[in-house]
């Protein structure tokens, strides 16, 4: 059987086809797997959890999907070393499953909270922002980036603020992750941070798993960028993430 990447389609996913298209463009072999086909994950060489609104974001974004039977198979694959990326709702599902904090459902050390500006809830935010990598050299998925890279990216969520317990907070400085920033790589408040938190994405399992709230699949090609980004020279492209992912399969 030809190795393939499982793009997991949950009830309410809406980015699985564009994500699969990007993976295919860069030499991966994506296969969209429904949430009720857990046995098909066993033969996959890697996983991508796409964006969307699984189960209409009822109760809490990602929490209902995180309890589906397919997550047991996904967890086993991740713990065996298979590379995995969760984007937006996929990131929320990984967080609710304990797969971004290497814990379990009984001890969730990392959660995704509602978007805030100061003490005010700001609801759903759909915009273009900038991010930069921290310690990319420590993650196989981020290894082609440098700490000086600044990348534009689309964001589209209402509950995207990373909340870490004290143990993970203390480890964050040594953990490969993505930070929101301005076009010069400097941190700041809203709207530089679209949800009130500085972290845009975080890695786990020796950097082979990435959960990221913004959408790299929407910022891969020049034609996807807003007009005011197109005439700038960027030091990096999200292609580097997909290529690194492909090489880990």
Please place each PLM-identified region on the residue numbering:
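Amide-donor transfer/coupling interface in amidating biosynthetic enzymes
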Residues: 43, 76-79, 110-249
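N-terminal beta1-alpha1 cap of cysteine-dependent amidohydrolase-like domains
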Residues: 1-87, 91-102, 114-125, 196, ...
């Amino acid at each position: 059987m030809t190795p393939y990447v499982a793009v997991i389609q949950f009830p309410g996913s809406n980015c699985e086809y564009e994500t699969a298209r990007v993976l295919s463009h860069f030499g991966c072999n994506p296969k969209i797997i429904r949430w009720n086909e857990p046995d098909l994950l066993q033969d996959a060489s890697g996983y991508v959890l796409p964006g969307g609104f699984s189960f209409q974001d009822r109760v809490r974004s990602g929490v209902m999907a995180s309890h589906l039977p397919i997550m047991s198979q996904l967890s086993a694959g991740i713990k065996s070393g298979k590379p995995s990326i969760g984007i937006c709702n996929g990131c929320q599902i990984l967080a609710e499953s304990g797969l971004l904090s290497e814990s379990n459902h009984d001890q969730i050390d990392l959660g995704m909270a509602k978007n805030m500006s100061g003490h005010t809830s700001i609801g759903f935010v759909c915009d273009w922002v900038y991010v930069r990598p921290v310690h990319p050299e420590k993650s196989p998925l981020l290894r082609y980036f440098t700490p000086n890279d600044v990348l534009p990216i689309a964001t589209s969520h209402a509950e995207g603020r990373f909340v870490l317990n004290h143990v993970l907070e203390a480890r964050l400085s040594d953990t490969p992750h993505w930070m929101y920033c301005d076009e010069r790589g400097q941190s700041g408040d809203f709207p530089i941070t679209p949800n009130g938190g500085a972290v845009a994405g975080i890695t786990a399992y020796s950097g082979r798993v990435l959960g990221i709230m913004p959408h790299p699949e929407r910022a891969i090609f020049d034609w996807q960028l807003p007009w005011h980004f197109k005439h700038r020279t960027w030091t990096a492209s999200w292609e580097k993430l997909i290529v690194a992912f492909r090489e880990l399969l």
